[in-house]
Each structure stands twice: as C-alpha cells, then as structure tokens.
Amino acid sequence: VETHGNRNADGGGGAPGFGNGLPNPRNGVPGGGSSVPGRAAGSGPGDGTGAPAPTASAGSAPSAGSSAAPVAAHPPVVGLAVSQRMYLPAGGGAQDLHAILTVRVEGVSGIEGADPGGAAPAPSLAEVLVVDCSASMKAPEKKIRAARQAAVTALKALPDGTPFAVVKGTHRAETVYPPSGPMRPASAQTRAEAERAVYAMMAGGGTCVGNWLSLAGELLAEQGAPIPHVLMLTDGRNEHDDRNPLAGVLDTWQGRFVCDAWGIGREWDARLLVRVTSRLHGSAYAVREESELPSAYDDLITGLLAKSLPELEIRVLISPGTRLRYLRQMFPTEGNPPQTEDGRAIAFTTRAWGNEVRRYQLCLTVDPAGRELGEDLQAALVEVAVPGAPPGSPAGSVSPGSLSVRLPPAQPCVVQWTDDPVLARTANEEVDHFAKHRQLGDTVALAADAFRLGRRNEAVTLLGVAVSLAHELGAQTQLAELQRIVEIRDPAAGHVVLRDGVQQIDFEYLITMSTHTTQGPTADGRPAGGVTVQPVAGLTDCPNCHVRVPSTAKFCPNCRHLLAPRVEAP
C-alpha cells in the first residue's frame, strides 16, 4: 500500500523495484477488520512484492497429456504492488475504498515452435483467425483482399506445431480450414493448404458475431491449448445478432479464450469491438488504410508469441464487513476479467502473460460503524496465484510441462477511519489517474453521440474536455486521434476547433483508442501528464478545407484540392 510517498523499494528477492515492507501475509495476517500487524496505528504500509524462493522443484509432474520438460533455472517472477487512498472520513457512512493493483511478470520465455512428431512439449498457443466475409467486405474490393492477405501473414508467423483454424464469418460461421476435423498443427503443408482456402473466400451475406465467436470457442475448447486465442476482423455492425445473441455468447466464453479484434473500412462499430474485447480479455484496434492490415497482424502475432505464461489469478480475500464492488483492468487496456467465488475468496482470471505490467482498479465498500479512529484495518487481502493452487501457496505449476512460477507475498488493502478533514481529503495519484482515463473514455463516447445527432456545439465542447484530459494524462495516442477531428489551440484549457470534413468513422477510431491507457504516475510519484501535443505522423492540413490528409497525398480526398508535393506536417 502506498501512502503519501512511503514506498519500500527493497526487492526482497522478487521483481526489481517492488519492496516488501510487511510480514508475509500468507503466514497469518488476520482478517475481520483487525489491525494490520507489524506497524503502529496510522503508519503507512509497504506496497512490496518481494517474491519468496519457489517451492516447486524441478522434476514436478507435468500436466496430463504433455511431454515432460525441465523447469527453467530461473522461473518467471511475479510481482504485486497495492497503491491506495487509505484515509476515509469516519462520519460519512459506508464508502468506497479504491486501490490500484500493479502486477508485473518477468523472466517469461516466448512461445517456440514444436516438432509435431518429436518429444517436445505441446505448443502453448492455439490460434483461430476469424475473417469477416459479409457482403460489405467487397465494397470496396480491396477490403476483402487485405483481409485475405492479413490472414495469410498471420498464418506464416505461427511457429511450427501451433494448432490453428480459419473461420469465415457472415450471418453464419464456417470453418474454411481445416475442411473437417480438429484444428491442424502449423507446418509448411498445412499453411499452404490454409492459404489456398483463405484466398478462395468470397464476400457475401450478413454479420452475426455471436456465431463467429461460438464456433471459434468450440474449436479452441476441443483443442485444449493453454493459451487459446482468436484474432477477429470486421468491417461492419452486428446486424444479425438475433441469430445468436452476442450477450449470451460472451457469458459462455468469457475467461475461456482471448480475443483481439480489428476494425477495417468506414462502417465498423467501435462499441462492438470494445464490448467483445473487454469481456474476452483482448484489445480493440483499427486500421485506416487496408494496406496497413497485414503488417499490423504480423506485429500482433509477434507480440502474442512473447506470452507463454497461460494465466494467473488475482484473488481478493474479503474481510467481514467489506463488500467487493468490482475489479477492472485499467492498463494497458481497459477490460473486465471474469470472476469466480469460493467462500471469502473471489478470483479474477487473467490470461496470456509475457514480460509485462498490468494494472487493475479494485473497489471495495467499507463501513465505519463500530470501528476505531486512527487504526489501520485490513479491508481485504490481495494475492496473485496460479489457477488451481490452494490459497496461500508460495508457488505453483502452470501448463504446459512443469513451469514453476515465483509468486509474491499477498498484500493488504487497508482503511483508516479519521475525523481529520485534511487526511480525509488526501488523494492518491494513481487512483486519480485511472479515474481520469475512464472520464476520457466516457467523454469521447458522449462526443461521438452528440456529433451523430447533429449537436456539433455540444460535440466540440466535449472534445475540448477530452483534449484537456488526454493532455493531462500524457495520452499521446488519444491526442493524435483527437487532432484528426479538432484543431487544438490550447490543450491544457481544452480550446479546440472542429475540422471540416469530419465524419462519424473518425469517432469510431477515437472510441477504440480510448481503451488503450497510459501506465500512470511513476514509482516516485511523478505525474505522467503535461505532455506537448505532437503532430500526427504523416498527416497535414489541406490548405483549402483544413481536413487532415496524408502528407504524401497529391490531392485532398475531401475537397479534391491539388496539394503541393511533400507537404510538411505543421
């Protein structure tokens, strides 16, 4: 727990930069609103993640059906830090207690190919490529051509032995490869066969995303790989949802595979992509030019292959009198991890880890009734665990093989009730940072709705608020998208002017990118914001209509004005 600048940086044998200023809560920190041991009342707890020495040893039994593999000499290390505002006013009744959980994983090796006929362990990854082949994909024809090429690019990037399938999506869902049976392992032969099947796909029909994801989930469930992944592309809207309602499909498959989704063209629905990826633990993306899609797919598959730790659980052990409101992923993208409950412990499943940092916002409801002032009380205990391991396990085994993982000590979420108004108003920079990110996303969505309904003045006002928030947060990606819609006169004050030629699709890109967040204040508490607004790379203003156009364009696509060669960005 970070309180007003107190941070223990002693690594404690775990991930660098994480300290362990408390006794190991796995060894018996009492719950039930009791005082946190080892500290005087009112002192700031540590936020450490020193990882204890692993107890899982080399030679532990591999999971059923996989080949034995030696445990790495230096297993992956998981770190956990909790940062929160701990002081709440005693006279305010039941209130929300917010904490930011930072989970860091280090020492993960990427996914490598497997020899299907050899003794190597089964591959960690199984991949299903879902390609929108609805009628709109042939208007223009270059969309379906780019989709085919992107799918082939992704196939070529898969390591040998990786099980894969290709699904053609319309109002129905059809497995075009393999033509029958289960997913096939990647090889020169199966890639060539799949490539022919992909290039034979023709556009026609409607769109039912529920059917696409259901078929992908069934293929992956039959395969049983530790890291099941879906890469979905669409250019439209879920117009045939009644055939297989998406809400029920997401309820069925949440937590069972990861889905990354891409928008292409001019008619796709950003909210649809965000809805799918936030429930299926993925990310939403979009490309403005069809030609960008193959390289974007290649980059995504490359990043995916760096994730070989299948999953971790964030467990929240609630003290009596505390109620869990939610846990959300806030960085690097926003999402809602699925949860299960077993007694007092609530487990949230997080999928497919590489060497990375993710941040989560935990919200608990606590009540001061019957509690002493000035005493540190444990509202909950947070731990990172391997799925299936008993509570308090210092290390565990993750499929495939016998991969040992070094887990950190659990960390308490602490509340201290106070009648000091100064303490009660003390903010936490990290909590505030992500609250502003959510405000940014909400503001962008409201601006999009106002623009769609013709309320341009309202849209401009909201876009000004969004620019001010993005500037404060240091969110360059969002600022770049905002610059396509407005001319930014004063980013701090939110003074903006709507550009000519703005279309609704520009807001779809903005909504999509608003789910990609910045990490927040650094370990020493410095804020992340206040950045200089940078010009969008490769764009310039048309001197005639002032629409943002590619700097290499010979004429403006909006007003057809002839542009001078090599126009420089302002």
Residues covered by each model-derived region:
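Acidic/polar low-complexity segments with low predicted structural confidence
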Residues: 1-118
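Exposed acidic/Ser/Thr-rich ligand/metal-binding surfaces
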Residues: 83-84, 93-311, 369-370, 474-475, ...
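Long, acidic serine/threonine- and proline-rich intrinsically disordered regions
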Residues: 366-570
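Low-complexity, intrinsically disordered segments enriched in Ser/Thr together with acidic residues
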Residues: 353-373
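Short aromatic-acidic-glycine turn motif
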Residues: 320-328, 389-393
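Short structured motifs
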Residues: 81-87, 298-299, 344-349, 364-366
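Extracellular adhesion/glycan-binding regions together with long Ser/Thr-
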Residues: 331-355
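Negatively charged
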Residues: 2-11, 17-31, 35-42, 46-54, ...
